[in-house]
Amino acid sequence: MSSRNLLYSSVVLFLVLFYCHGGPLEDRVRSTIQEVYKNCRKDKNPGVIVSVVKDGQNVLTEALGVKDKISGEAITTDTLFGLGGISALFANILIAKKNAEYAEMDEDTTLRNLFGNNKLFEKSKLRSRYATSLDVMAHRLGFKNTPHLFLDDTVTRGDPVIQRISSMKPRGRFRDSFYYNELTYSILTTIGERLGRDSWENLVKNEIYTPLGMAKSKFFTTLDPSTVDIARAYKEDDGSLFPVPFEFLKKWSSLCSTTCVLSSANDMSKFMNYLLGQRKPSWTKPCVTGPRKFTLILFDAI
């Protein structure tokens, strides 16, 4: 069971670049979305949020369905949903931003140099020597997905998860195969935290959420669900939907690799506008002091 299947069982989040703004066409789009949800997804997704953006503007936001099947309370465009694999985008942006703060460092810097370890992957000399953070982002390390390791209490952030990954045996060839792997993405969590000298959640909040005005967005790992407007996750099994306990989701998301982010239709429209180049957050301003010198002190060998 992947995080994508688990978290998307409660939400289908559409972030669409659509060429319409106002008038009958927008009404037809909204009507089509409502009909598709009613006829195709209502039995699979109790709640759905939709955002449509164009030219830096939020053209349409729509909230359909309910937050949970028991209360029947309607969702809104500010209701939080688990984003599953979209969390990886936040990890990638954070790495790119932190890389820009250090001289002689980018996404092609080898993990060997970052971690000061020439045997980072015990089963592969090739990966140990040449693997980069870009290889992690592109899922081209060739490791079969092992998401259930998220439930292992010994696999925590930092050295423990890196050590577990280092002992894994590759399934595919390096840079010549695509194996989606959520666990290896936690390498990026570790890099981000060590470069930023803070928790992944604080870094994403301070350097992505706040500059983009994503005031409602949260994290499974730090959230108290009783204090926010949040949709319940459901998992389909044998034709029926079953609620997923929040504590399970919190544990499942603890590595903050591809599972951690909670956001709303309104906030994600801001994020989508940024991805499309229509929003320039404060971090795009030139660095006044210049990049810092990269040092292996941040990455003690495991």
Swiss-Prot record:
GO terms for cellular component: membrane. The keyword Oxidoreductase does not apply. It is a single-pass membrane protein. The chain crosses the membrane at residues 75-95. Its main location: membrane. InterPro entries: Bact_CellWall_Synth/Modif, Beta-lactam-related, Beta-lactam/transpept-like. Component of the organic matrix of calcified shell layers. Keywords: Membrane, Signal, Transmembrane, Transmembrane helix. PANTHER family: BETA-LACTAMASE-RELATED DOMAIN-CONTAINING PROTEIN (PTHR46825:SF15), D-ALANYL-D-ALANINE-CARBOXYPEPTIDASE/ENDOPEPTIDASE AMPH (PTHR46825). This is Gigasin-6. It comes from Magallana gigas. The lineage of its organism: Eukaryota, Metazoa, Spiralia, Lophotrochozoa, Mollusca.
